[in-house]
Amino acid sequence: MENNIVNLEVEYFKRKNQEAYQTLMNKEFEKVNELLQEPLDKIEKSVKGETYCPQNIFEAGIFLNFLDKKVEQKDFAKVNYYDFYLMSAAANYNLNLLEKSREDYIKAIEFNPASSIARLQVLEIDKRQKNYATYLEDVKEFFKYAYRRSDIAKAYRDVGYYLYEVKDYEMALVAYYLSNVYEFTETAINEIKHIGETEKIDLDSKAWLSEKMMGEFHNKYKIPLLPSEKLTSLAIAMANDAESKKAFPVARFAYQVAYELTLEEGYLKKIEEMKNM
C-alpha cells in the first residue's frame, strides 16, 4: 500500500509530473532524468506492497477482476507512479541507455500490468539487443492484457520479426498476416513480400494462410490467434452494467473496447446511440 503520502505530496508529484512531461516533449532527455531523480527516490521509499495505477476505467476493471492479488492487497494509487517510470524509460531509451530503459519499463508494468506501451517497448528493446531469452513469454503475457487492435497488430509484427530472426520463415509469414488482420500496415506487407522473395516461398499459393498453418503457429508457439475471451467478456459486462446505470461515458468507452476486440457492428451502434447522453 501507499505509505507516508499526504495531500501535499500528491500536489508535489503532480507538479513534478507536469515538469518532466513538458521537458520530455522538448526532447531534453538528460534534464528529464534530473527532474525525475527526486520523485523516483520518493516513490521507492514511500510505496510499499501492491499498488496499481490504471490509466482508464477498463484497466481498473482488469485489475479488479483478473490480477492475482488478495482482496485486501488491492490498492489504487493516489499518484500516477506509472507515469514517472514511463517518462524515465522514454528518456533513457532516447539516450540509448537501453538496459536502464528496460528496467524502468518493467517498473512501469509493476504499477500497471495492462500497459501495452511498456510491454511493447520491452519487446522493442529486446529486439534491438537481440535478447530473446524471454521474448515469447513476454509476448504471451502481453496478450493477456491487450485490448487495442493497433497494439495487438504491433505485437504480431514483433513476433514476425523474432520468427524471421530464428529462421522460422513460414511461421513469420503467419505472424505478419495476423498483424494485418488487426491493423493493416505497409510494414507487414513489405515484410511478407521480403520473406517470400528471399526465402523463395510462393506467396500466391496461399498455403501459408491455411487453417493448418494457423494451427501450427498456435500450437508451436502458444501465441493466441484471437483476443482474450476474458477481456472481451469484461468489456461487454462493463458496458452493459454502465448503460443500465446511465453511466454513459463509461458505457461508451467499454463498448469501444468490446468493438475493438470483436468488430461487432452492434457495439458501434450502441456508441452512436449514446453519443449525446
Show which residues each predicted segment covers.
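Flexible helix-coil transition and linker loops at the boundaries of alpha-helical arrays
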Residues: 4-6, 42-81, 143-152, 223-225
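TPR-repeat structural position
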Residues: 29-30, 98, 132, 169-170, ...
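TPR alpha-solenoid repeat register
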Residues: 84, 118, 152-155, 188-189, ...
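Alpha-helical linker/edge segments of TPR/alpha-solenoid repeat scaffolds
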Residues: 59-76, 129-138, 161-171, 196-219, ...
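Short coil turns that delineate tetratricopeptide repeat
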Residues: 44, 113, 147-150, 183-184, ...
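Residue-level recognition of tetratricopeptide repeat
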Residues: 21, 90, 124, 161-162, ...
